[in-house]
Curated annotation (Swiss-Prot):
Interacts (via N-terminus) with the capsid assembly scaffolding protein (via C-terminus); capsid proteins and scaffolding proteins form building blocks that assemble to form the procapsid. Interacts with the portal protein. Changing residue 242 to A: Cold-sensitive phenotype probably due to an assembly defect. This is Major capsid protein. The insertion domain (I domain) plays an important role in the folding of the capsid protein by acting as an intramolecular chaperone. InterPro entries: Phage_coat_Gp5. Changing residue 61 to N/V: Drastically decreases capsid stability. The record marks 14 as: Essential for binding to the capsid assembly scaffolding protein. Changing residue 243 to A: No effect on phage production. The record marks 61 as: Involved in capsid stabilization and maturation. It is found in: Virion. Belongs to the P22 phage major capsid protein family. It comes from the Viruses.
Amino acid sequence: MALNEGQIVTLAVDEIIETISAITPMAQKAKKYTPPAASMQRSSNTIWMPVEQESPTQEGWDLTDKATGLLELNVAVNMGEPDNDFFQLRADDLRDETAYRRRIQSAARKLANNVELKVANMAAEMGSLVITSPDAIGTNTADAWNFVADAEEIMFSRELNRDMGTSYFFNPQDYKKAGYDLTKRDIFGRIPEEAYRDGTIQRQVAGFDDVLRSPKLPVLTKSTATGITVSGAQSFKPVAWQLDNDGNKVNVDNRFATVTLSATTGMKRGDKISFAGVKFLGQMAKNVLAQDATFSVVRVVDGTHVEITPKPVALDDVSLSPEQRAYANVNTSLADAMAVNILNVKDARTNVFWADDAIRIVSQPIPANHELFAGMKTTSFSIPDVGLNGIFATQGDISTLSGLCRIALWYGVNATRPEAIGVGLPGQTA
């Protein structure tokens, strides 16, 4: 029996929600946020959100004239344009309703793919915690465990907030190589049947809550930059605002810093770098770690300037106020002629990891229920597990006995805490 219009719409929306929910593991490990609609309309779909505050403390009985200020930093998050599947059907295309439903399922799979690609690319390009190995995974015994454990070690040592959980995503090739090391065995060392059947690696590997895989992870091509140094001594401060041309306060995005170099030839977005002698700090204890501080190139500005993340705030910068020093994340400022180390020296398909609130999916319902759109039929839906909102819309044309169908998702993927997003690159031998 043929389905009526209401049943077709219900089935279509259910198909979209179920399909996208089933194949978006990366997006489901991100934080979700629905911003207020009216304010987004007046701000070009950008909203400023606070990041975790850092507080300076001090000992003593008498703290007269020692009060510190409140410094709350912000990051800009935004939504892009809707992602759509827009197609036309004629009456004779609907004689077999299952063909229509298969098209809906196909659209949902493609839209889910696009979400996962955006998360994967954002993590690979913005991830600033960099774990490299000179060997490919699987070269030595237990090197897969060490590779993942190194990532967890730096997150733990940096004292990064991990209250929402942590996740690690291998690319398929490295997942296959790592599986033998990381799959849970019984007391006799036997690998369970499930590991062969569905590629399952146990949960809570090397401190990560979930270790998964994704075929969406991009290749980070090697950087061809060589012999680059810092040009001039440079230091950076965390600031909540700056004054515009009219003397009014405007927010500052503290994820980024513009660094002056001797040259930028061969550098590109996503390159991973470090500076000689610049070490990470534990965020709370402010102890200097053994690991070099690592950064991601966000943008090549011109022949001598690059924008990097995170902003390096130096503990030894005497010009910092107490509340600014609480945000210090490296031991020392950038010095003139300091060597810049390129970390991605070989092409490699990325592995990525993050604290689960480091990436944020921002989405809003599409307001298509206004009377201006009375000529079409729309059904709004949300996908809570993925944090997405969308519409299923149809419109018929009596002159051609055809109808248009549009499935749209409106969202943006944002790296709100790039300091808590990392990239694993094996095989990095120059």
